[in-house]
Amino acid sequence: MMSRLLVFLMLGAAFMLVVSANDAYGDEPAFKDLNQGDESLGKRKSCCPCWLRGNCFWGQNCYPEGCSGPKV
C-alpha cells in the first residue's frame, strides 16, 4: 500500500515539474521580438483574449488579434 502511495506522489511531483517548466517557458519573450528590437516585449506565448476585458491572469497582456496584435 505504501509503495502505491509513493508511486502516486512521485508521478504527481513529475507532472507539477513539467507544468511549471512549460509555464516558465511561456513567460519568455519571443526571440523574433528581441531580434527586431520590438519595444513591447509583451508578445509572448501566453496571452489572454480581450473578451476578458483586460482582466488577464499571471501578468499576461490582452491582445485583440491573438498574441501578435497590439496590446490593449
UniProtKB/Swiss-Prot annotation:
Residues 22-42 form a propeptide. Disulfide bonds join C47-C62, C48-C56, C50-C67. Its main location: secreted. It is found in: Secreted; Nematocyst. GO terms for cellular component: extracellular region; nematocyst. InterPro entries: Neurotoxin_3_Anemonia, Neurotoxin_3_sf. Residues 1-21 form the signal peptide. One of its GO terms (molecular function) is toxin activity. Keywords: Disulfide bond, Ion channel impairing toxin, Nematocyst, Neurotoxin, Secreted, Signal, Toxin, Voltage-gated sodium channel impairing toxin. Belongs to the sea anemone short toxin (type III) family. Voltage-gated sodium channel (Nav) inhibitor. 1 uM completely inhibits insect voltage-gated sodium channel inactivation (DmNav1 from D.melanogaster). This is Delta-actitoxin-Avd2b 3. It comes from Anemonia viridis (Snakelocks anemone).
